[in-house]
C-alpha cells in the first residue's frame, strides 16, 4: 500500500512559510498523509489531498458552475492610465462610461466609481495598440462581475446595466437560474474554499470559476435567491451613505437637528445594516451545507481554511477595552467612514465591514459588538470623530450644490458662509465639535484638515480646492 505525504503551508507571507518549513515541530502538525488510491480515477487528475468525504464527492458528483453561467474575460485597455478614471471627473463626458474595474475585495454591490474611455463600441480602445476588446456582444446581457484578485477570496457583485467589464473586473453571464442565487453561491465561504481546491493562484480566471461544483437546485431556489437579494439591498444602502459612490443619496432634514444624535444615527445605520447582512450570509452558508450534504468533518475542513461565519461567533464583550477598540476602529476606516476591506486578524477570508472584522479579531459575537458600540458610543472618541469629519465634508459639498459624483457642477463659497450655515444646522454644534475636535475651530478645520479628508475620500483626485478664504468645486 502506497501513501502520499503533503505538508500544507498556507500562511500568507514567505517569511512565515520559511519559518514553518525550518521548524520541525511546526511542520509536523501540517502533515497530511493520503492513500495513493484516492487519486486513482479522479475525473480531473487533481491532487486534492486535503479534502475527502462530502467535499471530495462534490467535485465528482455535482454539476459544474459553467453549466449554468458563462464567466468571461474582460477587455484589456493596453493603457490603464489613459483609459480608466474616476467617474466624478468624467460624468458629463459622453465618451466615458461606467466600468467594472475590479479594485479589490467587494461582494454584492459596489465599485462603481470608475469610468472608461469607451466611445462607440470601444472605438478608442480598439485604436490603441496592445489593447484587446473582449465579449463586446455580451455587455448588455451580463449581470455579474467579480474581482480577478482572489487574495481575500472570491467576491462577486451586480454589474450595472450597460456597464463595461475589463480584465480586472471580469463578467459573468447567467444562463440558467436566479441572479441573486448565483450571487449567494459565489459570495459564500464555501465557494471560496472550493475554488482554492482548484487553484492556489491569487488571480481568479474564468475557467476555474466554470469548474466550481455547485448544487444546481439552489441556483433557482427562491429562498436562496432572497438571501442574496437581501445582501445586495443592504450593501447598496450602505454604499448610498458614502459620498464617493454614484449610489450616494443624502437628504438633509429640514430645520435644526442634534449633531450628537446625527452622528450616532449614522453609525447605527452602518452597524445595523452590516449585522443584518451577516445574518443573511450565515443563512446562505447553512443552505449550501445542506444542499451539498456536507457533514461535520467537511464543515470543519472548510472552516479551518476560510474561518467561521462571523454571525456564528458567540464570544462576549465583558473584558473589552474601549480605548483599544477605538484605536483599532480608526485604523480600519477611511477618511470617508468606509471600512477598508482586508483579511481580519483571525480569519483567512476577507471581510467587508467593521463588525465582521472586530468579531474575528476578538472572537466575539457581532451582535454583542454592535450593542457595545452603540450603547457605549460616548467612549469611542476616534470612531465618532471619523463620522463627524465625514459629516462635515458632506455638509460643505452639499452647500456647494454637490449632490453625488455624477450630479454636481462648478461653484464656490466663502469659508465664512460655509461656517455660518453649518453652525445654524445643529443645535448642539459648539459642544459636540469641541468635545471631538478640542481647541480647533471649524474655520481652522476647514482650512487645515478638510483638504486632506476630501483628497483621501476622493482617491487622490479631488474636485474641492481652497483658495485663500474661498472654497471651489471644479473639474480642473
Language-model segments: residues:
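Terminal accessory regions of large proteins
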Residues: 276, 285-289, 297-476
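Polynucleotide-recognition surfaces of large bacterial nucleic-acid defense/processing enzymes
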Residues: 1-127, 132-143, 223-374
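Short, surface-exposed beta-strand/loop "edge" segments at domain boundaries and coil↔beta transitions
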Residues: 104-109, 152-155, 406-408
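C-terminal low-complexity, acidic/polar tails when present
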Residues: 126-140, 154, 458, 462-466, ...
Amino acid at each position: 500500500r502506497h501513501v502520499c505525504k503533503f505538508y500544507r503551508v498556507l500562511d500568507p507571507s514567505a517569511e512565515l512559510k520559511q519559518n514553518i518549513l525550518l521548524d520541525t515541530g511546526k511542520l509536523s502538525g501540517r502533515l497530511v498523509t493520503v492513500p495513493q488510491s484516492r487519486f486513482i480515477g479522479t475525473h480531473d487528475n487533481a491532487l486534492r489531498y486535503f479534502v475527502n468525504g462530502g467535499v471530495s464527492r462534490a467535485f465528482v458528483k455535482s454539476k459544474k458552475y459553467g453549466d449554468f453561467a458563462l464567466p468571461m474575460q474582460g477587455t484589456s485597455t493596453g493603457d490603464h492610465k489613459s483609459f480608466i478614471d474616476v467617474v466624478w471627473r468624467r460624468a458629463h463626458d459622453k465618451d466615458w462610461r461606467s466600468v467594472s474595474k475590479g479594485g479589490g475585495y467587494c461582494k454584492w454591490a459596489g465599485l462603481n466609481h470608475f469610468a472608461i474611455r469607451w466611445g462607440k463600441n470601444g472605438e478608442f480602445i480598439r485604436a490603441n495598440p496592445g489593447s484587446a476588446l473582449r465579449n463586446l456582444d455580451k455587455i448588455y446581457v451580463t449581470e455579474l462581475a467579480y474581482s480577478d484578485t482572489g487574495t481575500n477570496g472570491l467576491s462577486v457583485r451586480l454589474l450595472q446595466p450597460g456597464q463595461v467589464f475589463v480584465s480586472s473586473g471580469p463578467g459573468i453571464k447567467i444562463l440558467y437560474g436566479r441572479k441573486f442565487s448565483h450571487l449567494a453561491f459565489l459570495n459564500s465561504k464555501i465557494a471560496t474554499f472550493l475554488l482554492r481546491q482548484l487553484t492556489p493562484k491569487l488571480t481568479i480566471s474564468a475557467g476555474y470559476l466554470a469548474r466550481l461544483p455547485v448544487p444546481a437546485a439552489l441556483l433557482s431556489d427562491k429562498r436562496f435567491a432572497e438571501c442574496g437579494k437581501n445582501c445586495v439591498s443592504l450593501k447598496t444602502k450602505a454604499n448610498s451613505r458614502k459620498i464617493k459612490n454614484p449610489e450616494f443619496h443624502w437628504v438633509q432634514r429640514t430645520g435644526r437637528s442634534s449633531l450628537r444624535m446625527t452622528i450616532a444615527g449614522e453609525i447605527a445605520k452602518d452597524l445595523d445594516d452590516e449585522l443584518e447582512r451577516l445574518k443573511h450570509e450565515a443563512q446562505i452558508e447553512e443552505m449550501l451545507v445542506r444542499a451539498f450534504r456536507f457533514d461535520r468533518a467537511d464543515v470543519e475542513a472548510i472552516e479551518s481554511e476560510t474561518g467561521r461565519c462571523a454571525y456564528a461567533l458567540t464570544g462576549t464583550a465583558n473584558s473589552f477595552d474601549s480605548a483599544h477598540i477605538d484605536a483599532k476602529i480608526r485604523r480600519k476606516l477611511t477618511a470617508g467612514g468606509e471600512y477598508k476591506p482586508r483579511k481580519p486578524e483571525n480569519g483567512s477570508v476577507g471581510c467587508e465591514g467593521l463588525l465582521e472584522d472586530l468579531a474575528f479579531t476578538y472572537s466575539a459575537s457581532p451582535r454583542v459588538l454592535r450593542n457595545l458600540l452603540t450603547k457605549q458610543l460616548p467612549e469611542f472618541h476616534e470612531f465618532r470623530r471619523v463620522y463627524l469629519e465625514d459629516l462635515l465634508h458632506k455638509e460643505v459639498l452639499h452647500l456647494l450644490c454637490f449632490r453625488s459624483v455624477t450630479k454636481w457642477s462648478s461653484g464656490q463659497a466663502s469659508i465664512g458662509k460655509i461656517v455660518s450655515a453649518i453652525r445654524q444646522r445643529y443645535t448642539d454644534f459648539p459642544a459636540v465639535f469641541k468635545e471631538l475636535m478640542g481647541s480647533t475651530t471649524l474655520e481652522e478645520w476647514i482650512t487645515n484638515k478638510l483638504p486632506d479628508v476630501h483628497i483621501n475620500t476622493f482617491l487622490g483626485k479631488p474636485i474641492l480646492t481652497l483658495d485663500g478664504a474661498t472654497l471651489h468645486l471644479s473639474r480642473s
